[in-house]
Amino acid sequence: MKKTDSSSPDEMTNDTMKVNELVGIFQGADENHDAKGKVSISGKNIRLENFEVTNGPDLYVYLVEEGQETKKGISLGKLKGNIGNQNYKIPGDHSASSGMEIVIWCKQFNVDFGRAELGKAM
């Protein structure tokens, strides 16, 4: 995968996301799958910053309930790159809440690469 830095007109930055509703810090799933960086969620907008995850095939971003199997969560789309800032939108009438997680998941092998538990921003 490639390094990304989303630069769309609706890009969320630290300046535009001064009041984050939810935040989390990525952690790797195990010794073979590392993840780091920050996730910020404001409304339906999700921002991964200083993000890095072990490269792998068929990686997707999911929003999951606590204890929920990743593939049963809400797909936010294919991972745009394994390094760099990136943006996603929560689809339809779904929403994020404290205690949920953002998970980087390999669809091909049904393996989690990393996750960030969401909590209220301070």
Question: How should each PLM-predicted stretch be described?
Answer:
Residues 68-77:
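Surface-exposed loop/edge segments in extracytoplasmic proteins
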Residues 48-50, 84-93:
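Exposed aromatic-hydrophobic patches
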Residues 60-62:
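Beta-strand signatures of extracellular beta-sandwich domains
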Residues 92-117:
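Short, exposed beta-strand-loop hairpins at the edges of beta-sheets
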Residues 78-84:
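Short proline/glycine- and polar residue-rich coil/turn motifs
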Residues 65-67, 108, 122:
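Solvent-exposed strand-loop boundary residues in beta-sheet-rich modules
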Residues 54-56, 96:
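Short proline/glycine-enriched turn/loop motifs at strand-loop junctions of beta-rich domains
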Residues 1-42, 121-122:
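Transition segment at domain starts
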